[in-house]
């Protein structure tokens, strides 16, 4: 077996349909108020999302067993070529750490240094110790720093471009991506260890190897067949646009609106025809002031009377006012589509917004915070236009330069030093419509969006009058006596409980270390 074959297994574990269904469609699209659910969970969407986090943990372990198997396999079978496979080893490591950051957001402490022993030549380590985030982050930062250096300097390397789903073998872009992941790590550290975070950011932003256009974005591109594996289509079975997100998109005439969602069928002719049907009840009557772009309430207590939520059909025409997400953004094969799939890890716009925030924190970066912000907004508009074309979404219409200029000139979008951070956070939230682990992480770090934020204003979520909160981590229970790796599992939980804001083991509202 060529060792690069294992790289595909790592890439495939970065996201799959199961993780997307459980974590995004059923949870974070709703928690972050991009969408409202029309199927699944209902009253317990903010408390008992039982499947949430299970697949991301499984995918982390899959990525780990293959990423750490690569160097062992080479040492055991191709020792004379070990140096020539340095790039392959480091690329797999970068992917694993990226997945580790995501997984640790949900679970806190993870097995890493001692993990996957049976796959990497250490079969004696059957019960690995767990490491806290405070221990993991310096390890990951150092490994990323070393990986960037090796990727920049390695020579006489064996090509794996046919298995490189991000950059097709372009190692200069992998160096930039590695530094981008370091900046992501630094942002996680900003609350707990601000000086260390800023030192990492300073090092990255002065390195000369950072993203400078949308084509540098750290994105995995899969083929059409990959999008047929699992329930990628479920986004349109489960979710519709939220009133919060649609209000924002309409208020600022954001051209990404037509890329994120499909226009509804509420033409004047269709509305008149539906309202005239003998079978249309008074409750089903469609108000004539509804537009082609509408969102629905996320709050359970408001859904029963939400006219935008009611399911209606005119023959086979879907007349529900709430807009459907563009399904091919998730499943290129939807409706006989021919496009592939994509997994955003760190986009150029994402990088710009992180750099803008660190610049506001006093980190010299070669640009002002305003320049980073404006570059990020433009990059987001251009990237989403490009990716929507790649996905062959329904009724695709590219975003024009004129639309970008008009959007950027609006009050609330044009740079305003008095609300600079909120502007950065708002645009970060929009950018992460698909990569919503990151908008969730931002919410956990800075509390944005919220019911009091101005550019994007969440609605308060109530279930039978009780105010709901966004979950912040996985619920835990102590392992049963005699269960695998019992002592280390117990120590893991006891160590996390030492943090004052960790909360009860079984509370999804407790905090992981970096949030505090």
Question: Where do the model's predicted regions map?
Answer:
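Conserved, well-structured interaction surfaces
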Residues: 34-113, 117-159, 338-343
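Membrane-proximal, proline-rich intrinsically disordered regions
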Residues: 1-33, 37-40, 75-79, 449, ...
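Internal, well-ordered domain-core segments that constitute the primary functional module
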Residues: 138-222
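Extended ligand-binding clefts on enzyme/binding-domain cores
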Residues: 201-352, 359-457
